[in-house]
Amino acid sequence: MFDRRLILLATPRQIGVLDWRPGHMHWLGEFPHSAKGLADFRQMVIEHAGLPMLLVADTVDEDYRSEVLPHVKGRARDELLARKLKQVFRNARFLGAWRQERETTGRRDDRYLLAAFADADWLTPWLSVLHRERVPLSGITPLALACQYLLDKLRVHEPHTLLVFRLSYGLRLSYYQNGLLRFSRLIGGDTPTQLPGNAADDIAKTQLYLTGQRILPREARLHVLLFDPSGQLDSAQAQLNADPRSAHACSI
């Protein structure tokens, strides 16, 4: 069981803070990326001194790669992943590798998801505050990767799931195969969000892309989950469900 911690939801524009403990969540507020926002954030950190924090970042400047690598353990695995990460993401400061599954045939190699923030200089001021205040930072993770645990908690067991978040700064679409992240993209970023009517088109284009890249099997039926407290994606849900050839969509 995890103990109490603060979850930091960071974007290039701001950072939000969630006070989390088992069975309970409390929103502490948002802090804009400005001198005053950083000062207020520092005060909040001081008031919660000693609590571990997890930083969940959401930005268009992210990259994901799926790699199949030899099944090795210990130091050999660490060295293998370090070489592969440096090869794939040459200049990235924040990067990581997550073992997802083991192949069932051949050499039974391991399948990894490699991820990196291509441009994450905007994170530096927030991390500097945490460093100065000696905050125990348990990790930095992309939002799409963190949502693997959300699917598990929601008991979503569909083999092919597209998770669609309507956010104040854009539309996040993430594809999960058997609960594991395979692809994600953020539409909008720092620009104003698109009109809700475009969401169904974006979902359809994403499905075509996944099929074209052979990430999503051509015959697979995509299960779409729409997260939108404002209800602005209702029209997208209706459009998707009206076409029997399309994905099946439902709101949560």
Predicted region positions:
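Hydrophobic/aromatic-enriched cytosolic interaction surfaces used to assemble or bind macromolecules
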Residues: 1-252
